[in-house]
Every structure is written in C-alpha cells, then in structure tokens.
C-alpha cells in the first residue's frame, strides 16, 4: 500500500515509513483488555495427544520401539509396560466404550511388577557405572547419586523427552511424574540386561553433567570428615586458612578459605559469604578432590561406555563410616527440616549504624532521594508515575 502511495506522489520530496507499533487510540486499550482477560482466565486446558484425529496407537508404539533402540520387543510387552494400574478404573474403559484412547482395546495387564523389577535393574547398572568412574568415592556418595538420578523427577523428564507421556495408559490427565517415571522403570523390567545397560548409558548417565556432587551429598560436618581421611593417608596437621576477603563491612561480604595439609599443600579452597560457610565449602571441595571428582574428570558415554565391562564393578566401594573415627559425624544435612536463620537483624542494623555508616556514609539511595519524587517535567498526573519506595538495611 505504501509503495502504491509513494508512486502516486511522483517527484515530491516525501518520505513514508511504516511503524509496526503504531496503534490507533481505541486499539491500544482493546488489546490491553484482551491481555488482561487472558490473564484472568489462565491458559487453555491441556489436550491429550490421543484426542487428535491422526492418532494411531500401534504406529506410535512401533516408532517408540525404534526410538528407544529396542525394536525386537513385542507390542504386547510394550503395552503392558506402559499401562498403569489406574487405567482400568477409567469410566470409558470400564464401560467398554469403542475407541477409548490411548489403545484401550488391547492389553489387560498393568506394569506394577515390572516397575519393581526395572527399578532394581536400573540401580544395578547405574551403580556399576558410577563405581567404575568414581573408584575412590565412598559407597554413600554412589547411593546418593543413584537415588537422585532414579527419582521420579529425573526419570519423568527423560520419559517426557522420549515421548512416553503420550503412550502411557493411565486414568489421570495430565499424567503425573510418578506414573511417567514408573513407565520408564517398567521398560527396564521388560528389557534384557544388555538393553538395560544401554538404556542407562544412553539416557540416564548423561544427566550427570547437570549434577553438583557437593549438593548431592551434603555432609553435616565435612571438615571433620576430610580431617579423618587425610590423617588416614599420613597427613599430620590440617588447617583452614583465609586466603582473601572483601566487603567485610558491606551487605555482601566474601571470604576465600583454603584447607592446607601439613602447612604446605592446598587440598581444597572455596568462597563463602561467611567464614563458617567458606570453611564448609572448602572442606567439600577437598573431599571431592580426594575422591578424584574434579572438573577435568572425563566420563564415558555412548559406545565408549558400552564397551566397558561393568559387570566387574558389582562389589560396593568402601564405607565412609569405616574410614572415619567413631566420633565423626558422617550424616548428611536434612533439608526437609527447617533451619533457623543465623542472622540477627538487630545486630546487623546496629553494626550498619555504628560501623558501616561511620566509614562509608549514607547509601546511594538516600543521597538521591529527590530523584524518586513524583511527577516530571511534563507535569503529568500522579497516575502515570508511581513513587518508588527504596529500602535499605537500616
């Protein structure tokens, strides 16, 4: 349209430019009203994939068998592994309604037994893989990683990427994490040992990349544990030292602490917002170094991992309680229990008023209070500008 108008203008010195965000006076309010209506109503309800006309359960199972790398498994075995016990309680299944989806006309067994068997198979092969790579780590760490990678949340995420959510036959919709994870476990109960090994290596082991090993196994007293382990290796003296610190009198201080063995060797260092936290993090870093878990650690994936004889690593590693002295606390932190905050607000306010304020003066927001006043040079109404409320520690 603009090109046609420009041609009719001829040689006039006129420039026409279209603005995408230019709206008429009524249109802006209309679009804003539609936006707020959608905010109130919320998102559209989820629609099951099986409700679409191009759904074919048999074809989906055939494609899934090739996608997961086990096309030789029969369709009946897949259906049993993907059938939740609650599926037969659905009204359309109980009433024998024709074309009840997904695939209600086939299979009368559920996956309760396969879930238990598959969970054991997955745990066996995953622990073997972890013992191969983490030979110096205690068995408690191996079990903590195994428990994390095989929980409902992690397995449900893997199942979602594989498209298992659309194939599971269950009463609930949307499908819960527990049902999705149980379907993945049931598949491991159907597969042979070699297929379960490949299933662990191809889909579960890659999740190790996103794991923080210090958070997976949070010891309550890591300094005491690392002290016992170093002394068992011949170290006579263990000492935490402050390497650097900054902002001690600010709201965000930082301390860098290192753990030294025999006053010469730095076995681990880390930073923290307080000395206690920095020592705790440095001790955790020292433990990971002792167990040969570093950022340079190379994990085997794919064919390289499949060629490793993992059957040799069925025996558990050493126990941490055997290496430490009887009085050492080897328990982990229970995050489910509420912990009282160690910060004392009254002490922080008095410290700011007596120490920080005397040294650095007023904060930037207090010195620029006039910048936050209402109104502007255009003298607009108060409805267009809402006065911010800057807050400080004091």
From Swiss-Prot:
Transit peptide start-stop: 1-21
Major subcellular site: mitochondrion
The keyword Mitochondrion belongs to this UniProt entry's keyword annotation: yes
Pfam families (UniProt xref): DSRM_MRPL44, RM44_endonuclase
Subcellular location: Mitochondrion
Keywords for the protein's UniProt record, in alphabetical order: Mitochondrion, Ribonucleoprotein, Ribosomal protein, Transit peptide
Family per record: Belongs to the ribonuclease III family. Mitochondrion-specific ribosomal protein mL44 subfamily.
Protein name as catalogued: Large ribosomal subunit protein mL44
